[in-house]
Amino acid sequence: MVTNTSGKKKTAVARATVREGEGRVRIDSQPVELVDPELAQLKMLEPFRIAEDDLRGEVDVEVSVEGGGVMGQADAARTAIARGLVDHTNDAELRDAFMEFDRSLLVNDVRQSEPKKWGGPGARARYQKSYR
């Protein structure tokens, strides 16, 4: 059985394919062990740590990520992988374990950065005003 899922964070979009296999996890066609920085790698593997590690040996996961920055992509991939595992195993206990650990594992974080406006250096900050 093949399961396709997706995850989003800021402008990053990850699409994951979960199928029966022997535990390969690939991010953009390269093994997850080669992902840098290590923090992003740990974040992507979180769903396997919460689910039992024997689950990792039963499935192959392929993730393609585009847009955003390094950590945004890691969060999007993490969500896509977690959703894929839940859909693939069809396990309510696993879903509850993910929700108890961190809701963003299964639910996209819809927050976006506010666009910059004129009259200041950022979205809300204004340029300093001088009276004399």
Swiss-Prot record:
Q: Which GO terms describe its cellular component?
A: cytosolic small ribosomal subunit
Task: Note the coiled coil stretches, chain numbering.
Answer: none
Q: Output one GO BP term.
A: maturation of SSU-rRNA from tricistronic rRNA transcript (SSU-rRNA, 5.8S rRNA, LSU-rRNA)
- Where is the region Disordered? 112-132
User: What's a single GO MF annotation on this record?
Assistant: structural constituent of ribosome
The record's listing under PROSITE patterns reads: RIBOSOMAL_S9 (PS00360)
**What keyword terms does UniProt attach to this protein?**
Ribonucleoprotein, Ribosomal protein
Q: Name one Pfam family in it.
A: Ribosomal_S9
Which Gene3D superfamilies is this protein grouped with? 3.30.230.10
Task: Report whether Manganese shows up as a keyword of the record.
Answer: no
What domain of life does the UniProt record list for this protein's source? Answer: Archaea
Q: Which family does it belong to?
A: Belongs to the universal ribosomal protein uS9 family.
The record ties this protein, via HAMAP family, to: Ribosomal_uS9_A
- Name of the molecule in the record: Small ribosomal subunit protein uS9
Organism from which the protein derives:
Haloarcula marismortui (strain ATCC 43049 / DSM 3752 / JCM 8966 / VKM B-1809)
